[in-house]
Amino acid sequence: MAVPKRRTSKTRKNKRRTHIKLAVPGMTECPNCGEYKLSHRVCKNCGLYNGEEVVSK
């Protein structure tokens, strides 16, 4: 059975794992208040979605 000849270093291990990561969510600016919000979702700050008040604050 094959075994590693040398121990894999931390640097080599981390370089191999550079592509294993989470994607950053798409953030957009709210046209009403200017706060950043997730796309296609209600703004947490002002409660508007697509120009209509969905959540009253």
UniProtKB/Swiss-Prot annotation:
What's the superkingdom here? Bacteria
Q: Which UniProt keywords apply?
A: Ribonucleoprotein, Ribosomal protein
MF terms from GO for this chain are: structural constituent of ribosome
Its Gene Ontology biological processes? translation
Q: Which GO terms describe its cellular component?
A: large ribosomal subunit
Q: Name one Pfam family in it.
A: Ribosomal_L32p
SUPFAM superfamilies assigned? Zn-binding ribosomal proteins
Keyword field contains Ribonucleoprotein: yes
Q: What InterPro entries does its record include?
A: Ribosomal_bL32, Ribosomal_bL32_bact, Ribosomal_zn-bd
Query: Which family does the similarity line name?
Result: Belongs to the bacterial ribosomal protein bL32 family.
Cited HAMAP family: Ribosomal_bL32
Write the protein's name: Large ribosomal subunit protein bL32
Species of the source: Staphylococcus carnosus (strain TM300)
